[in-house]
Amino acid sequence: MSEFLVFVGSLNREAPYFQGARGVGLSVFRFDEETLEATKLAETGEVDNPTYLSVSADGSFVYANSEVSAWREGVVTAYRFDRRDATLAYMNKQPTLGSITAHNFITRDGSKLLVANYGMGEGGPDQSVVAYGIRADGALTAPLASVAHKGAGPNPDRQERAHAHSVTETVGGGVAVVADLGIDRLVSYRIGADGTLDRLAETTLPPGAGPRHVALHPDGRYLFVMNELDSTVASLSLDGTSGALALIDVKPAVPAEAREHNYCADIQISPDGRFLYGSNRGHDSVAVFSIDQETGKLACEDFTPCGGATPRNLCLTPTGRHLFSANQNADRISIFSRDAQTGRLVDTGRAIEIGTPMCVKITV
């Protein structure tokens, strides 16, 4: 298959910590991997600041977080995408029980949605992680369960409290791993059939690291994390049953001279598990690492200019042939070809031009 669906969330409301809002909201494109042509199929501006999206495996449903700084509580909205007439239809929305809603993840069995709230407190609900059921029609149930993280880290500006930044699920399913930037921890939870979240384990990263996004090796043995605050990338061994993690390796995600003015963002693993890609805001690059399959250790192979500014989010096509970089402050999603043998990226010069892209997801 050479054609895929590309879902894009773009900023459409100003926020004090973002540099402008020039986007529509939620957009859907058809991408031809042979011609590199992207054709817009649908869009809606009815969802506020969809800074993160998850898309069902068949591309029929999309779940969008709304990150609005003035709200004491965020929302997550469900949309249905109909391929036949290329339309987006609103399904429903649910409160996120926390503020600055940062991330979400569809469980591997498709039955639940997990949401992470960065959280600023400020008098509203203050839950860090929330679980929802996904109904047969794709709509979301009311929240099934939630948990709150507590604590702080050594960085007084960014780690004054817990800040859950992302959530994923182990390859075998049933265990969620949450990256909390504020407390330098990865926290694992058992996901109950009824949506309950029971804490299993906590893993502490180096002080001031600021874990943001994580990615799993395809075979589930390793977990990798981009640390936003100290511009490093870490690899850990993972027990998918117990949720236990053990630190293997930490490497700089940018050259030494760039670390002071850089904030790591997203992370992707190639389909064959041999390469890791991490985005650097400030250095405006995509770091390329090879992964030792026996040990999980990382080796830096390259730094590729991101084709714009502020690469907030990355996504690989299902074939692994191309990587998309959502360059927030350049109003474009740059498209790179990828060498499967070396892992290296080449800017194709092609892009999806769209205002303040925050998240890009690609599915068949």
Task: Kindly give the residue locations of the regions a language model identified.
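Loop-centered beta-sheet repeat module
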Residues: 173-230
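Beta-rich, blade/repeat-based domains predominating
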Residues: 48-57, 97-108, 120-121, 150-172, ...
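Short loop/turn segments immediately following beta-strands, especially the blade-tip
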Residues: 29-36, 78-86, 131-141, 189-196, ...
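Blade-level signature of beta-propeller repeat domains, shared across WD40, Kelch, NHL, RCC1
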Residues: 329-337, 346-364
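A short beta-strand motif characteristic of beta-propeller blades
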Residues: 39-45, 89-95, 151-158, 198-204, ...
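Short, solvent-exposed loop/turn segments at conserved positions within beta-propeller repeat blades
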Residues: 16-24, 68-75, 121-127, 179-183, ...
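Blade-loop segments of beta-propeller domains
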Residues: 39-110
